Amino acid sequence: SLGSWTRPQLMSNHNYPKWEIELSANEFNQPVNYKYVIVKLDNHNIATWEEGENRLLMPFVPPVEDSIFIVNDEKFRYPVGNFKGAGVAVPVFSLRTNESFGVGEFNDIRKLVDWCTLTGLKMIQVLPINETVATHSWLDSYPYKSITVMALHPMYLHLPGLGALKDAALMEEFEKARLELNARPHVDYVGVNRNKARYFKLIFDQNWPEVSKLESYQQFFEANKEWLKPYAAFCYLRDRFKTSDFRQWEEYATYNPELIDQLTDPSQDFHEHIAVHYYQQYYLDKQLREVVEYAHSKGVAMKGDIPIGISPNSIEAWTEPHLFNLDGQAGAPPDDFAVMGQNW
């Protein structure tokens, strides 16, 4: 019943990076040899065996009834040894190309992947790419002060991936803005996001009836609605009350799942202001997945940086305040980089 070297017992990663499994002590009335394996996701067939001698587990004799015996093993022994390689760390917003809209986008990572392939680099680390919009100003440009640990920043969407507007005059207007923003020596954060937000609304109004019926969209929504609905509600309330400080949101100041369900109900006459965030996150997920798959196909790993903590005016602080010490702050002392110090 333990597998007999042919049928692996699947372990849980619910406590990642630890992998765990519970087994009956009745199975261990004699010494047991075992190894760890990596299995394929689709059929659970063994893809890789760990190297080295078999691991050995001696019989467990419980001192009292209902005893628990815990075994902590060493790490998986990869047959090719531990990975070692060089990489590059870069903010996505700095990867502007001729195809960009004034800022580096997920689509632009492809060219960095190609460069890594040419130079022998094996890993790309990007600065945080989560949504940071709290004030709709340049203050939101700091990538480490996100309003969510789940949603991605709409700024990184490659607009052609959403489709073209049917209005040719509008497309010409956006192309002119794109060229102007792309020609500037620095990222015009406010200008980029103002223009992109306008495009998002126009393309959403045009294509949402069809996109909302796509099976791929419906699967995305069902798989992510636990965080997607609170995120969309947060963005709507942020704009409605003109602040990301949820403590000023009157009856919504204290998170209530029932109120959020009412707020995100498709029958609401303002539902388009909710659904546009679903729409953006669907395409962000799609475009990022495509570029990560492209990187993997070239033998380049993708790695993301994350902030040290959450913003006090964030979705997680609103929905799960019991998980955080919201009276605490973190930062760094003064140095040559920031002579006044930093308050993160």
Regions found by a protein language model. Give the residues of each.
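Aromatic-rich carbohydrate-binding modules that target alpha-glucans
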Residues: 1-30, 37-62, 101, 139-144
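A generic structural signal for short, solvent-exposed coil/turn residues
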Residues: 2-3, 13, 28, 49, ...
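Extracellular beta-sheet/turn segments enriched in Thr/Pro/Gly and aliphatic residues
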Residues: 55-78
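Short, well-ordered strand-loop elements centered on a beta-strand within folded domains, enriched
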Residues: 45-50, 65-71, 245
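Acidic/aromatic-lined carbohydrate-recognition and catalytic surfaces
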Residues: 77-321
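Short, conserved beta-strand segments within well-ordered enzyme catalytic domains
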Residues: 35-37, 125
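Active-site-adjacent "gating/activation" loops or surface patches in catalytic cores
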Residues: 316-344
